[in-house]
Amino acid sequence: MHAAVPWVVTWDDHEFDNNCAGDISEQPGVTAADFLKRRAAAYQAYYEHMPLRRSALPKGPDMLIYRSLSFGALAQFFVLDTRQYRTDQPCGDGIKPQCPEALGAEGTMMGLEQRDWLFRGLDTSPAKWNALAQQVMIARVDRVAGEKAGYSMDQWPGYEFERRQLLKFLHEHKTANPVAFAGDIHSNWANELIADFDDLGSKSVATEFVGTSISSGGDGRAEPKGLTELLAENPFVKFHNAERGYVRCEVTPATWRTDFRTVEYVSRPGAPLQTRASFVVEDGRTVLNRA
């Protein structure tokens, strides 16, 4: 693939430890010192095998991977790191209601320095489209049907104060055409990021596309279990699919088109490739239109 197209890479968690946060391992009994030794080795291996700038050269267990890439006046990509600087997942991690810890200002996904860098970059970007290429879903998706609520504490809803801070910034600073990207959860999503997730009728201030895995997780499903209930609970979710595949985008000054390319199976050769869904975002309108 790299012989055919250029790569812009970033990591998530499995390069070093599932659901890691800062210097905290998910595994019980692993000290911060031991985890940082593992992280230093993982960073070195990552740097040696990925196309990265020299500025990303690791220094022991530290590696500066967040950066921006400019494609003229058309698009600016802000590649974030939401693992290395985050605080521990609140509420014991997992799918939980938002406990006070998840709502507190002390929790951070990006860390202060990266957050300020991002906000400065968005404020000064001359681009028509501003993309946030990062690790985990921003939309506050309720995974529990009915009156009870459950959100992923590993995703941005576990860091609700900073999540709201980000969306408020995009709205109040009138960031041009913000489009967020994520991965992590081996499934496809197309979301409208509304200003207030407590008011499901509030205005969308950005759009979000979550890309599936190429092969991890097996064959997957076109319609995940509980899809009808999930869409009813979360009307800002415009598409969800758990097949394997990739996301393809075509960007022009007038539109951003995203195609969800999937296959029905990966457990044997020969699966035909299809476009399962397509969405178009028009310049100046942060809503999703089915193509």
Mark where each language-model region is.
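Metal-dependent phosphoester/phosphodiester hydrolase catalytic core
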Residues: 1-291
